[in-house]
Amino acid sequence: MSLEPGSLLRERYRIEGRLGQGGMGAVYRAYDLTLEIEVALKENLNPNPESERQFKREARLLANLRHPNLPRVTDHFVLEGQQYLVMDYIEGEDLQSLLGKRPVSVSEALHWADDMVEALHFLHTRTPPVIHRDIKPANLKLQPDGNLVLVDF
């Protein structure tokens, strides 16, 4: 189901617009009316039993991760048979877009690499280890403060 801007889910999350779509789901920018913050809302686009199980597992797993280079998951719910994850909205531009616009200095690239090594080390040392499976420039967002965040689990 495609969510239109202005749609309200659970009388709490107001859809502002679509951020992107991947194989597993669509991600929307939304506004949490309760907490008065912007969030990212991921919709499971494959509502079959295996996909639903995997989506719920992802929600539980990510909700327990706390790291500055990873978004936090703050809610998971089912509405009219459709599953949703709510997570931090990460402000900034993805590296794929950024790299197409300007050259990158060695010091910037090293800082970003350091951020990713820290995030991956954190993920891989969990019990059980968390594997991202889709690390690419489009899934790395550069925040205004210069830190990189790994998104789209």
Predicted regions and their residues:
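AlphaC helix of the eukaryotic protein kinase fold
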Residues: L45-N64
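Flexible N-lobe loop architecture of eukaryotic-like protein kinase catalytic domains
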Residues: G20, R57, R66-N69
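Activation segment signature within eukaryotic-like protein kinase domains
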Residues: W112-A113
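Protein kinase catalytic-loop region centered on the HRD/HxD motif
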Residues: E118-V130
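Activation-segment/catalytic-loop signature of the eukaryotic protein kinase fold
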Residues: H76
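Conserved N-lobe loop of protein kinases adjacent to the ATP-binding glycine-rich P-loop
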Residues: Y31-E38
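Conserved short submotifs of the Hanks-type protein kinase catalytic core
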Residues: E80-D94, L98
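Protein kinase glycine-rich loop
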Residues: E16-G22, V27
